[in-house]
C-alpha cells in the first residue's frame, strides 16, 4: 500500500506528484494494466515464451 503524508505547509500538487512517483516505482500501474482483462492460459504461455526468447537474445 502506497501512502504519502502531506506536510503542514506542503502543496497538494507536490504530494500528488510524490504519490504518483511512488505508485510508478512500486509497479502498481503495470500490475493493474496486466490484470485489467482476463488472460487465458494459452495467452499466458505465449507471453512467457516471448519473454524467454527476448531474454535469451539479450544475454548474447
From Swiss-Prot:
GO biological process: translation
Basic residues bias spans: 44-60
A Gene Ontology term for the protein's cellular component: ribonucleoprotein complex
Keyword match Ribonucleoprotein: yes
Superkingdom of the organism of origin: Bacteria
Keywords attached to this entry: Ribonucleoprotein, Ribosomal protein
Pfam families linked: Ribosomal_S21 (PF01165)
Residue segments, region Disordered: 39-60
Any one GO molecular-function label of the UniProt entry: structural constituent of ribosome
Similarity comment text for this entry: Belongs to the bacterial ribosomal protein bS21 family.
PANTHER family: MITOCHONDRIAL 28S RIBOSOMAL PROTEIN S21 (PTHR21109), SMALL RIBOSOMAL SUBUNIT PROTEIN BS21M (PTHR21109:SF0)
Protein name (database record): Small ribosomal subunit protein bS21
Native source species: Microcystis aeruginosa (strain NIES-843 / IAM M-2473)
